[in-house]
Amino acid sequence: MPGYVTNPASAPARESWYAEPAKVFDNLYFVGGQVHSAWALTTSEGIILIDTIFPYNSEELIVGGMQKVGLDPKNIKYVLISHAHSDHIGGAEMLQARYRAHVVMGGPDWDSVAKYPNRYKTMAPKRDIVATDGMKVTLGTTSVTIWLTPGHTPGTLSYTFTVLDRGRPVNVAYSGGTAFNFVNNTPDPGIKNFQIYIDSQQKMAERAAATRATVLLANHSEFDNAVNKNRMLAGRGSGAHPYEIGADWVQRHFQVTQGCARAAQLRLEQKAVETTKR
């Protein structure tokens, strides 16, 4: 799916990306698509939006989706961008300009937006808040803690925060970059890049454990199965929340990402050894 579409008429067919918005927790709403996520965290003083999808569908999915579930997008106060790829930063410029929302992003990714104006045409918010490790974005009594987790991009951010399920506090770990979207096919710099990724995944495993996170969210609905879980919510009744997988399974996610990265890193290390023998 293309990240940047100059002509909206050439955007992918709506049926390939549209998903219904949903109230997932008392104070957290899904306003994303079939593959890419966006989340609206409501507070007593406004809304914290996490990720903004593509330029061509952020209007319908985020603005329209929020309105559909009874939220006013004018109340967006902060927009957190997990990383500066077009499937997450796509609507940030529009939301910043229209609602005067503060945009929070990792420093290296802010630098990328400034360095490549053509790449980020229509999705280049004005440089605003540069995230730092452990920074808290707070509205009212609700806070999102930001963690620097480079790897997917140099400025990737992940988060921990608390939501409410029928009044019961539930802790969330949010992964800001899962795939190996970096130079990974040559020993240099692939081995180093994988180590950066592994270290960040270990860091988030530790943060998730420290906060006793029992929910794992991602900025891709294909990774946390958001769309299917949203359907399950409709028939939940008095049963368990489909998003609450338990602390052990949250840890397993980060173990798997580290293990996959280490396996790929080992292949590059072997490739480097074979190259030196020639």
Where are each of the predicted segments found?
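Accessory terminal helices/loops
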Residues: M1-E15, R166, F180-R278
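Metallo-beta-lactamase
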Residues: V5-P8, K23-F25, L71, N75, ...
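Conserved beta-strand hairpin/beta-sheet module of binuclear metal-dependent hydrolase folds
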Residues: R14-V69, P73, S158-N181
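Solvent-exposed, acidic/flexible segments
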Residues: Y18, Q34, T52-P55, E59, ...
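Helix-coil boundary/capping segments in enzymes
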Residues: F25, T42-T43, S58, V63-V69, ...
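Active-site HxH/HxHxD metal-binding segment of metal-dependent hydrolases
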Residues: L28, N57-E60, G64-K136, R231, ...
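Active-site neighborhood of phospho(di)ester-bond hydrolases with catalytic His/Asp-centered motifs
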Residues: I50-T52, K77-A84, V103-G106, L148-G151, ...
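Active-site environment of divalent metal-dependent phosphoester hydrolases
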Residues: N57, A84-G90, W110-V113, P154-L157, ...
